[in-house]
Design a protein with these regions (language model features):
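Catalytic cores of DNA base-excision repair glycosylases
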Residues: 2-198
Length: 200
């Protein structure tokens, strides 16, 4: 029998211990999109002021689309990975042209937007629209492979796809987005690269 995830225990832990992060205080799809593009390979403490400044400078998709690329790059300056800023700018223009400046609620439509990959799409659908959709980033991959004792090579796309299916199967019908956030939080704070198993 496959090992099961104790969603209630995980949810209880998360609600008690979660970090107070600005993008967790909103269900605005645009704000969540920006945070999820900024966060990979970047420390949360570094991202917070950039996120707050970005949202003040470009409060909506339309504001971002109307800005010049130079202004967008200058606002992003210091975060690195400048292609992300360009993709955000191009994506915003596309959203204005095709979806009236709104992020759509449907996965197939989100896939059409340049720069949106499986994780970011899952995060938007889950955290903004509260859909039952897994959001599998590096933190979640680490948690699942350790918890379920998986030894497959996570560098292989087939393994990542398998983990996405596993994560999807673990989500409860009630408040599934909290389990997504909890798995990410667990990987970011306890189940880190250097495991803190004693704290889990």
């Amino acid at each position: 029998m496959q090992k099961k995830l104790d969603c209630l225990r995980l949810k209880t832990w998360f609600l008690a211990e979660k970090r107070d992060l600005p993008w967790r205080q909103t269900t605005d799809p645009y704000a969540i999109w920006i945070s999820e593009v900024m966060l990979p390979q970047t420390q949360v403490a570094v991202v917070i002021p950039y996120f707050l400044n970005w949202m003040q400078r470009f409060p909506t998709i339309r504001h971002l689309a109307a800005a010049s690329l130079d202004e967008v790059i200058k606002t992003w300056e210091g975060l690195g990975y400048y292609s992300r800023a360009r993709y955000l700018h191009e994506g915003a223009k596309e959203l204005v042209a095709r979806f009236d400046g709104e992020l759509p609620r449907h996965e197939e439509l989100l896939k059409k937007i340049k720069g949106l990959g499986p994780y970011t799409i899952g995060a938007i659908l889950s955290f903004a629209f509260h859909q039952k959709k897994a959001a599998v980033d590096g933190n979640v991959i680490r948690v699942l492979t350790r918890y379920f004792g998986l030894e497959e090579d996570i560098a292989k796309p087939a393994t990542v796809n398998q983990l996405r299916h596993l994560a999807q199967s673990l989500l409860p019908d009630e408040e599934p987005w909290i389990i997504n956030e909890a798995l990410i939080e667990l990987g970011a704070t306890i189940c880190q690269r250097k495991a803190r198993c004693h704290a889990c």
